[in-house]
């Protein structure tokens, strides 16, 4: 998922099957229950999720591939199981999701290099 974002479910109406997810950027995006990736068609308010944003009906932005209990790697963008900023390891690039390094991009911590350097190095590997 290249445009993966993180957020939390702000509201969900089981009867109608519609909900809102608040993205990390502060915007609220609507979604339909068929976009919940575990197939349950229901989700609790407050659940941390990853999702992608696509143009939906009538040109409105909609959340798709709403995935509960996951986090988006700040280095490579891949979606991983687990909680965000809980020192989980990315299965794609090996980044340890350190909350301090997420806030202070040039700091080292759980990872030997900073988030800024890791992103630069990851982009360089893709360019080859």
Regions found by a protein language model. Give the residues of each.
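Structural detector for short beta-strands of small beta-barrel domains
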Residues: 2-14
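Short nucleic-acid-contacting surface segments enriched for D/E, G, S/T with interspersed K/R
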Residues: 37-50
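OB-fold/S1-family single-stranded nucleic acid-binding modules
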Residues: 54-69
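Short cysteine-rich clusters marking metal-coordination/redox-active sites
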Residues: 73-76, 90-93
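Cys/His-rich microdomains that often coordinate metals
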Residues: 80-81, 94-97
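Short, intrinsically disordered terminal segments enriched in charged and Pro/Gly residues
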Residues: 103-128
